[in-house]
Amino acid sequence: MSLDTVALNQRMTHFDGHAEVWLFGYGSLIFKADFPFLARRPASIAGWSRRFWQGSMDHRGTQEAPGRVVTLESDALATCHGMAYLVTPEEFAHLDHREKNGYLRLPVTITFDDASTAEGMVYIATADNAAYLGEASEADIARHIAGAAGPSGPNRDYLLALAQALRELGRPDAHVFEIERHLVALAG
């Protein structure tokens, strides 16, 4: 699949005709909402694990030295916690551009903290996209992150901001926190 997924996402019609759509964020969308939204609520999606397996050549790395950012991996026993935003379809163009580095819009059932649910969408970078880096140990991922930077800043800032946002939500993530632990140890 192409690295730039904007055109693919613009052809998706699942939410055509909707005046508003819930968007589930599990990475930088938790702590950096640079788009207008009608509502924001802590939420989760079942059957997915957050993993630092996606390369970032556009935000937290470069073509020559990609950073690592999160995507979701199918995991029947897992629940991924994050933040849901109610947005209008007019925001899709901005979001598609922001998530262009291999992420596709997919429909998902979002569960809010009060146990109510809504159909919504999530951006997921699947293993068949050109920027996918794949599985590595948390220690190796931390070393990779420590040396990467891109137009949006050092890759380490992304990891640390995500870990802090998850703490503020009261939703620990063992994978994220273990990478953070290794990164802090590397910094000495």
Model region roles, listed by residue range:
Residues M1-G188:
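A glycine-rich, hydrophobic/aromatic-adjacent loop/helix-cap motif
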